[in-house]
Amino acid sequence: MIALKAPRVHVFLAEKGVGSRRFCEELIRKKLVRVNNTIAKLGDKVTLGDRIIYKKQIFVFKDFQINNRIYLALNKPRNYLCSNFDVDGRKLAISLVQPLFKERVFSIGRLDFKSSGLLLFTNDGKFANDIIHPRQKVEREYIIESKKDIDENLLISFKSGIKVKKEFFKLKSYEILNKNSARLILDEGKNREIRKVFLSKNIFLKKIHRIRIGNINLDSLKEGQVKIVPLSKINSLKSRLEKLNDNSN
């Protein structure tokens, strides 16, 4: 179970030593406090990752309690690496997540350096393994954009199954959105699968953006932001995975 504190702005500032709760209420009435880039109003609550600004002081809300397991979603920007360390000093996706949390978490699978979108983090090893195991057929949905026109013949071949340098790739379904863009659904998480297939035909994709894993959607999560995935979503997905495991035994 995850219990997330969501204090009102004036309570949070008081806990940070800015002044009494009443004093902090007055600061808000006088429009001297901002949450991120918006002037705070009385009654506003802070959420995970919010930056509360008063004069030159900046406080980041990261106070919450974790019991048992935690499940997080990040909207990974391009040019962030899915690793805990990089000898070349590139930016790490974990750096957008770990500072907000007391528990050590790790990513469930990866998104390549140039790709963006939904990346899940957890401290639940079994759940992570179930998500990435090929037998589970967990869907991953992407929006792609190409500099060239999308070749539907390539997508048809990809859906039928295609070999690239002795590696077999297969698309579950696709939808062409316009001449340069398409929606792809995969049910395996092979490394750089989409990019490899298109590069095999000398097609460079300028955008690969993941918007869904199973029943977990990116929704309106902004680039670089993190949210806690509701346990109702996690439990629903776990239930589906457990049924598949039972049927395979």
Swiss-Prot record:
Its EC number is 5.4.99.-. SUPFAM superfamilies: Alpha-L RNA-binding motif, Pseudouridine synthase. SMART domains: S4. Keywords: Isomerase, RNA-binding. Residues 7-64 form the S4 RNA-binding domain. It comes from the Bacteria. The keyword Transferase does not apply. It catalyses: a uridine in RNA = a pseudouridine in RNA. InterPro entries: PsdUridine_s_RsuA/RluB/E/F_cat, PsdUridine_synth_cat_dom_sf, PsdUridine_synth_RsuA/RluA, PsdUridine_synth_RsuA/RluB/E/F, PsdUridine_synth_RsuA/RluB_CS, RsuA_PseudoU_synthase, S4_RNA-bd, S4_RNA-bd_sf. It is an enzyme of class 5 (isomerase). The active site is at 112 (nucleophile). GO terms for molecular function: RNA binding; rRNA pseudouridine synthase activity. GO terms for biological process: enzyme-directed rRNA pseudouridine synthesis. Belongs to the pseudouridine synthase RsuA family. PANTHER family: PSEUDOURIDINE SYNTHASE FAMILY PROTEIN-RELATED (PTHR47683), RNA-BINDING S4 DOMAIN-CONTAINING PROTEIN (PTHR47683:SF2). This is Uncharacterized RNA pseudouridine synthase BB_0129.
